[in-house]
Structures are given as structure tokens and as C-alpha cells.
């Protein structure tokens, strides 16, 4: 009987002991979580400081934050908000500038919309044809490329927003002559050169050599090969062979894609070195803090795929463009291209497939 009377206290003792163990385990888990949190905060803090140092060489430009001045209107924003992914996409204007000397005005030789799509884990590069016939505030209808010469990045952003009902508030720009240095600093890019492109590439290599008063070194021949910065830059400038300006914008996207691929290929350890090299050659309206936040967001979302497209879409403009008052333009069906562009950016429906 005495044994039976002693059983309940043993069960109670085991219960108390188990509770103590659970409390100790929870405390230990909390300590581990706190330690991990402190380590993460330290890494983020140190990483942010390091990132600020790396990005300090970038040239920052202030542009208007007034949405109306940038061509962003309430009715357009409301139309974009119907897309479920609206808050997961950031659109930035990217300009490739053709400025051969500091005293010469900049012209946007390449115009792209970079869409950071965290919903589909993609970076989308959409080329907008430079000769697209668009409305430019204060200048009537003209070629898209002229907006930058008329009013710099601010007017170019406004032109994109007003003609394509977008919400772009920031831009990044690279002078094509700096692009040569960027590509060389990364060890060149591998491209497949067609036979009919060789002569044209060498023509532009010669032109650049004459402008910069440097030796002329022509490309030897066609085929897959690693191009220097000057050779790759000359490749992007070809427009008189193949499918003219359409193929030219395709070449620009190919080089940019190869360049981004090269940076990715280097891995995270070589990223600081590469960013430090590239920073002085970039102009942007984005602040350093904004860029760090964007980069961290990209990293955490696992956004790695790069995809390209082109606007206007085939079938929405007259073949070969159109002469208007003695000048060649590319008029296009605006409503259809707005629809194609929005569906691509926000619904991941590729317009060129």
C-alpha cells in the first residue's frame, strides 16, 4: 500500500521536472534567437557601412519629386493599381548616353525601362525605340531620343510616363564611352558576332579611335568570342545592316545582359570590387540608402533572372517607319503598346513572344 501512496508524488515530480526542462529549453532558444538577431544586425550594419563606402563614387543628381512634374497622374496610378503585383514592381528609367565631350549636350542613344519584378523574381529590361514618335512636353511630337537633349533625365522620365502611363520616379545613366571602361574592367563580354556585323564594328572602332586619339585595333572576324569594351560598344552602335534600329536595340540589350551576367558570374565575393569600379561611371537620382535597400530587397527575394523585351511591339507600327515633314519617325499604336507594356511589367506576359 505504501508504494501505491508514493506513486503520485513521483508523477508530480516528473511533471515539474519536465516543465523546468521546457522552460530552460525556451530560454536557451530565446538566447540563440537573440544571438542570431544580434549577429544579423551587426552584419547588416557593417554591410550597410561597407555598401555606403562602395557606392560613394556614384554621381547623384537631384530631380523633381513632384509626381505631376514627372508626368505621373492619379488616373494612371489608379489604372496600374488594378494589377495585384503593383506594389512588388519598381520601374526605373535607364539611359545610355552619347556624349563625346564635356561641352557637348547629352543625347539618349538608348532608352530602357528596368522593371525589378519581385513577384516573378525577374529583372526586366524593356528597350523603347529611340525614334518612337512621342509627345514631349513643350516640344510637340518628336523622337523619344530628343527628350534627353531638350530637358535631361527629368523630361525624359516625364515623356516615358506620359506616353506609356507609367510611374517612373528615378533613373540611372551611363555614357557609352564609359561603358567601354566598365566592360574592360570586368574582363570583356562574350558575344556571337555575325559576319555582316564585322565590317560595321570595325567602322565604329575606327571612329572611336579617331575621337579618343588612340590606336585602331580592328576585330579579326565573326564567331563567338570575348570582346573588349571598345569592340562591344561598337557592336551596340550598328544600325545600317540587319534589321536596322530594331536589331540595334536588341544588341544593346544583349550587351547589357552579358554585362549583368558577368557581374553575377563573379559571385558575391567579387561584388564589392566590381561595384567600386562601376560606381564613378554611373549617374542616378537614387540615393545611396535607396540603392542599398533595393539591393537587399533583391537579395532577400531571390530575384536573379534577367529578361529583355522591346516596345513598340511588332505589328503596331508601319514597316520601315514613316517620313513626317522630311524626317524619319517611328509612329506606333499607343494604346496597344501601353497594354502590352503593362501586361509585361505587371502580369509577366512577354510582348515579343
Q: What positions do the PLM features span?
A:
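Entry/capping segment at the start of metal-dependent catalytic domains
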Residues: 2-8, 26-120, 313
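C-terminal solvent-exposed extensions
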Residues: 72-82, 88, 101, 135, ...
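N-terminal post-signal-peptidase region of extra-cytosolic proteins
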Residues: 75-81, 94-101, 107-112, 146-161, ...
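Extracytoplasmic
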Residues: 87-90, 106-111, 120-128, 139, ...
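Second-shell loop/turn segments in exported
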Residues: 99-103, 142-150, 165-170, 222, ...
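Extracytoplasmic/secreted envelope proteins and their assembly/folding machinery
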Residues: 108-110, 141, 145, 153-161, ...
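Amphipathic, coiled-coil-like alpha-helical scaffolding segments used for oligomerization/assembly
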Residues: 147-214, 287
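Flexible, polar/acidic helix-loop-strand segments at domain edges
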Residues: 184-270, 351-352
Amino acid at each position: 500500500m505504501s508504494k501505491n501512496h508514493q506513486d503520485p508524488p513521483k508523477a508530480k515530480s516528473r511533471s515539474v521536472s519536465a516543465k523546468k526542462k521546457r522552460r530552460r529549453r525556451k530560454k536557451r532558444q530565446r538566447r540563440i534567437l537573440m544571438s542570431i538577431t544580434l549577429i544579423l544586425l551587426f552584419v547588416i550594419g557593417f554591410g550597410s557601412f561597407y555598401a555606403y563606402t562602395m557606392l560613394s563614387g556614384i554621381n547623384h543628381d537631384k530631380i523633381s519629386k513632384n509626381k505631376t512634374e514627372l508626368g505621373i497622374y492619379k488616373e494612371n496610378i489608379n489604372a496600374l493599381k488594378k494589377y495585384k503585383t503593383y506594389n512588388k514592381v519598381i520601374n526605373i528609367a535607364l539611359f545610355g548616353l552619347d556624349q563625346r565631350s564635356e561641352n557637348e549636350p547629352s543625347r539618349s542613344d538608348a532608352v530602357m525601362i528596368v522593371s525589378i519584378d519581385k513577384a516573378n523574381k525577374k529583372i526586366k529590361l524593356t528597350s523603347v525605340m529611340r525614334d518612337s514618335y512621342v509627345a514631349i512636353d513643350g516640344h510637340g511630337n518628336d523622337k523619344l531620343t530628343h527628350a534627353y537633349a531638350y530637358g535631361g533625365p527629368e523630361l525624359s522620365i516625364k515623356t516615358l510616363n506620359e506616353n506609356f502611363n507609367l510611374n517612373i520616379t528615378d533613373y540611372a545613366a551611363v555614357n557609352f564611352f564609359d561603358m567601354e571602361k566598365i566592360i574592360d574592367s570586368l574582363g570583356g563580354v562574350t558575344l556571337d558576332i555575325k559576319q555582316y556585323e564585322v565590317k560595321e564594328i570595325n567602322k565604329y572602332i575606327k571612329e572611336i579611335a579617331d575621337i579618343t586619339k588612340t590606336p585602331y585595333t580592328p576585330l579579326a572576324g565573326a564567331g563567338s568570342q570575348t570582346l573588349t569594351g571598345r569592340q562591344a560598344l561598337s557592336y551596340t552602335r550598328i544600325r545600317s545592316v540587319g534589321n536596322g534600329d530594331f536589331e540595334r536595340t536588341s544588341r544593346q540589350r544583349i550587351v547589357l545582359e552579358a554585362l549583368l551576367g558577368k557581374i553575377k558570374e563573379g559571385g558575391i565575393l567579387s561584388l564589392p570590387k566590381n561595384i567600386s569600379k562601376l560606381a564613378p561611371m554611373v549617374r542616378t537620382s537614387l540615393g545611396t540608402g535607396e540603392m542599398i535597400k533595393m539591393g537587399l530587397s533583391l537579395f532577400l527575394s531571390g530575384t536573379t533572372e534577367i529578361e529583355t523585351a522591346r516596345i513598340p511591339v511588332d505589328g503596331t507600327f508601319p514597316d520601315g517607319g514613316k517620313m513626317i515633314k522630311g524626317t524619319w519617325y517611328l509612329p506606333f499604336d499607343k494604346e496597344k503598346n501601353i497594354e502590352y507594356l503593362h501586361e509585361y511589367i505587371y502580369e509577366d506576359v512577354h510582348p515579343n513572344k
